[in-house]
Amino acid sequence: MNRILILLFIVWIYILSIFKRKKLAYFSFLFGSVGMFVFLFVILYPLLTMPLTKFVCDLTGIIGNATGIFKAYSSYGILFIENIEAGPVSLYIDFECAGLVENLVFLSLLTFFPAYKWFEKIWIGIVGVLAVMSANVLRLTVICIMIHMWGNDVYYLAHTIVGRLLFYLLSISLYFYVFTRRQIRKQRIGEFEYNGEND
């Protein structure tokens, strides 16, 4: 497996260098981002999934302890939600809730995004990862609050619809600010002339 991964990495670097030499910016961005995500995911998935799960659980638990609505047991990756009618409800924080995929996608796109310099990418990468983690914690908090208020019957609505919708909206906002807005500002717009005057 390691040999195959190394071989694929060498091929990826070689093809990427061809795109760079030919100045094919779009293919460099696309091929580079996808390749970086795949390699990082294969390498980091077994290493960071559990630590990230515990970290997200601990961060969410701070809010739970402050409000008294739920408690975090990071060793097991579980949030225990207090509900008067149904009793304690457990919410297991799995791989999806860890935020590893979302962070790797963001960092991979940012690495090959040509509108930033390297020192800018490092700073934005740190802020972006913190933003994704915060959005994830907020999503879990909203899910816990909904279950606390209305019981286990709203689990599907809270987790699958409301929680994901909130997380995706925050992620789209981050992507717009980092990528789309920057690209628009980088565009050169010619001057317009109206009634003989430049505007």
What are these regions (language model features)?
Residues 1-199:
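Hydrophobic N-terminal alpha-helices or hydrophobic patches in metabolic proteins across all domains
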